[in-house]
């Protein structure tokens, strides 16, 4: 199965108008477990806490 490179961007920092943190990862596009956008809890160094990061498109 092919894997695609995706970028995860912080949603909370974007809403607050602060610098957003971004992470680069891969995902399996044909996976039945994650049909929509990928969401993960990752650390944002600008906010100094763990926040929700969503897949950018």
Curated annotation (Swiss-Prot):
Protein's UniProt keywords contain Membrane: no
GO CC terms, sorted: cytoplasm; ribonucleoprotein complex; ribosome
GO MF assignments: structural constituent of ribosome
Keywords: Ribonucleoprotein, Ribosomal protein
GO biological process: translation
InterPro entries: Ribosomal_bL33, Ribosomal_bL33_sf, Ribosomal_zn-bd
Pfam families from the UniProt entry: Ribosomal_L33
Hydrolase recorded as keyword: no
Family the UniProt entry places it in: Belongs to the bacterial ribosomal protein bL33 family.
UniProt-recorded name of the protein: Large ribosomal subunit protein bL33
Native species: Akkermansia muciniphila (strain ATCC BAA-835 / DSM 22959 / JCM 33894 / BCRC 81048 / CCUG 64013 / CIP 107961 / Muc)
Gene that encodes it: rpmG
């Amino acid at each position: 199965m092919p894997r695609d490179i995706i970028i995860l961007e912080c949603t909370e920092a974007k809403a607050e108008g602060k610098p957003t943190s971004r992470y680069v990862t891969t995902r399996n596009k044909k996976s039945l477990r994650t049909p929509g956008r990928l969401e993960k809890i990752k650390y944002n160094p600008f906010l100094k806490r763990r926040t929700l990061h969503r897949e950018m498109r």
